[in-house]
């Protein structure tokens, strides 16, 4: 019989992560690379492991991720969101804990667009009264 697989899609900023959970040893693979190799920042790797910590399932699932768009922070947030959604498929009872930790909510904050006549989104050249 085929092994159980659980899927979830996560989004954050401009990053989209497609996540698959397979019962295993806790190995995380991102775009066919080990997570330590793909995401160099330890604090961002902690962000990725948050859903497992909240549901006390660390080391229970191997994670396979395909992520596109954004930078390290956006991709880490998208992976976290995808893992949380996939864990819901594993056990719907996780919903309460994941919701309380805020892991099921799509972070809607996006980069504000640059406006014409300004240097950045809100930065204007210095105002001179006289």
UniProtKB/Swiss-Prot annotation:
GO terms for cellular component: cytosolic small ribosomal subunit. Keywords: Ribonucleoprotein, Ribosomal protein. InterPro entries: Ribosomal_Su5_D2-typ_SF, Ribosomal_uS9, Ribosomal_uS9_bac/plastid, Ribosomal_uS9_CS, Ribsml_uS5_D2-typ_fold_subgr. GO terms for biological process: translation. Gene3D superfamilies: 3.30.230.10. One of its GO terms (molecular function) is structural constituent of ribosome. Coiled coil: none annotated. It comes from the Bacteria. The keyword GTP-binding does not apply. Pfam families: Ribosomal_S9 (PF00380). The keyword Ribosomal protein applies. Belongs to the universal ribosomal protein uS9 family. This is Small ribosomal subunit protein uS9.
